[in-house]
Amino acid sequence: MTFSFTATVLGSPRIGPNRELKKAVESYWAGRLDAEGLDALARDLRRRTWTSLRDAGLDSVPVNTFSYYDHVLDTAAMLGALPDRVAGIESDLDRYFAAARGNDTVAPLEMTRWFDTNYHYLVPEISPTTTFALDPSKVLRELEEARALDIPARPVVVGPVTFLLLSKAVGSDAPLLDRLDELVPLYADLLGRLAGAGADWVQIDEPALVADRNPKEIAAAKRAYDRLSGLELRPAILVASYFGSLGDALPAIASTGVEGIAIDLVAGSDTLATVPDLTRKHVVAGVVDGRNIWRTDLDAALASLGTLLGSTGSLAVSTSCSLLHVPYTLDAETGIDKALRSWLAFGTEKVREVVTLGTALTSGRESVDDEFALARAAASTRNTDRRLHDATVRARLDALTASDPGRSPAAERREAQSALSLPVLPTTTIGSYPQTTQIRVARAARRKGEIDEAEYLKRMRAEVADVVALQEKLDLDVLVHGEPERNDMVQYFAEQLDGFFATDNGWVQSYGSRCVRPPILYGDVRRSNPMTVEWITYAQSLTQRPVKGMLTGPVTILAWSFVRDDQPLADSANQVALAIRDETVDLQGAGIRIVQVDEPALRELLPLRAADQPGYLDWSVGAFRLATSGVSDSTQIHTHLCYSEFGEVIEAIARLDADVTSIEAARSHMEVLDDLSAVGFDLGVGPGVYDIHSPRVPGVEEIAASLREALKAVPVERLWVNPDCGLKTRGPAEVEASLRNLVDAAKLVRAEL
């Protein structure tokens, strides 16, 4: 009989507790570290991760969750589905990174958000000529490494249904799921090899099944797992779901011969008692939240587990999803107050909670009474802490009226904004400029106490002056100050708003080597002082051209933070919106004529099921409009959106009512413009004309061709010219070359009009 484990997690972080992987990968890209050195570091990171999970008490440890860049890209490589354009690159590793990042001659794969999280994956491209072929070397190697360390290893792979549903069809309109029969034999081969290598269990992730799926898709998934579970030589199969309820897919998967099903009981609401086939399954219950950082209510979690005991064959405790989405450990946080610390659980602490619940399930709650008592005490102090309830903030929210989130009609605003006297096809950038060595040195010196605040501010003002001078030299029309003072577009504001806490080492992976430190929104939000006015007005004093005020919108601040779970998201969004509204009014009062309120994460919080989406879109649009409706008609409001499948939220983008919307569109080849046209979008739009996530410098004619394509869908008087995202992560030389070509392309197309 297959061994049934009792405590596990669905995945773990891979960047390293001190971002070791990020630094090593970037050193490899820069030529400072060779492939052997990178491999040695990766092997050590895997060893440390697996042994810490085993030693914490997990009796099944996920492996193959490590990745140099992205686990979906790893799956494409495993299935022989990297794009043809990288085939000529000799090195496997360089071919992999070229698909992820591109190079001087190769465009990268598109990137988009992983379901409704702030992690982003590379979108595989599947064409009619794609010939799938199995390369199991990575997963087999990691299994071998783990077994050599006496790790109770459970290999993890992205499932065939999810892989196809998340991929992009190229050169054909046929549904990619029609090719499932081509993939199932490869997975069958993989299962046989894993069994031969000693795997007792394999976890096959199928999170795509928690979104709305039609009967044909569910039937296809059932057929696939009927075939895989019918194999004679294979490990036990755990089909893992997360980020929501399986719904109709649950009985379909339960009716197959797979031994286990992992279910998200934090984000989902599946009623297991209604699925009789689960009485023959090993159910892995995700009762510890893998996406947020709040301490688990152990009493409630154990009660939930208790209700499942009669509905399942056997039961294990787990996180609701991979711990990829939370920081490593609270131990690295030294500046956090005692009360707030007691309310939190990062990765290490969540593993401890899983083990505690597993012990309570198998040995009785009395065996872990102390842990349960600590959890109860933390919940009690959180419920009574005065920081969570600010009477002034609550009164202001209660006083809002239906007219507060509204502005004048767009035509009236356009007339008032004509005083800006901008040319057709005005050029601008999204906001941030490269974080130069000088910026990083100054920031580190201030942190170590080697320079005082006055010297730091002096150096940052010099950076602002350099960025303004560069933009004038390049002849851009609307300028930005470059954001040298900002370490992160959300954390910068969180550090200045009451109700937030910014961690020292709470790093999580956003994509590739890009890591972020999401702040913690734990209480009511209030702005005590202006946050950006001094920086923007200084930049404006250096030029006669308009300089944009740069703010982050309320939805993005929520999406890229760990948000309190004791009140509706809409309430927290409106609190943040009022703080941003006050800042826009202050910027206008200081003479700033254009204010950009970025909402790159608008799509990320969209619920996965259609029935839940209208409510979210109502409050998210309302929060943006509340944040931007305090200014006069003559102040031009911009917003920026990125990493999004805009078709699903395109009407909401129009409802934001921003005067100009810049959109990441370079990797998706301007597809979003057709969606905008279809909903009658009649405001300014700046589709990104080149991809800043790739180090390649686009040519003038390449950018001009993108502009000509955009003009087929957008009237010239409404089209803006900009990159598709901020320039923070790029090098100064490539930024200058790219922007020079952008301006030259705009001038070229203007001359053709």
Swiss-Prot record:
Binding of L-homocysteine, residues: I430, G431, S432, E483, D598
Pathway given in the UniProt record: Amino-acid biosynthesis; L-methionine biosynthesis via de novo pathway; L-methionine from L-homocysteine (MetE route): step 1/1
Keyword Repeat among record annotations: yes
Cofactor note: Binds 1 zinc ion per subunit.
Enzyme Commission number(s) from the entry: 2.1.1.14
Catalytic site positions: H693
Keywords, ordered alphabetically: Amino-acid biosynthesis, Metal-binding, Methionine biosynthesis, Methyltransferase, Repeat, Transferase, Zinc
Primary role: Catalyzes the transfer of a methyl group from 5-methyltetrahydrofolate to homocysteine resulting in methionine formation.
Protein name per UniProt: 5-methyltetrahydropteroyltriglutamate--homocysteine methyltransferase
Natural source organism: Rhodococcus jostii (strain RHA1)
Lineage: Bacteria, Bacillati, Actinomycetota, Actinomycetes, Mycobacteriales
Gene that encodes it: metE
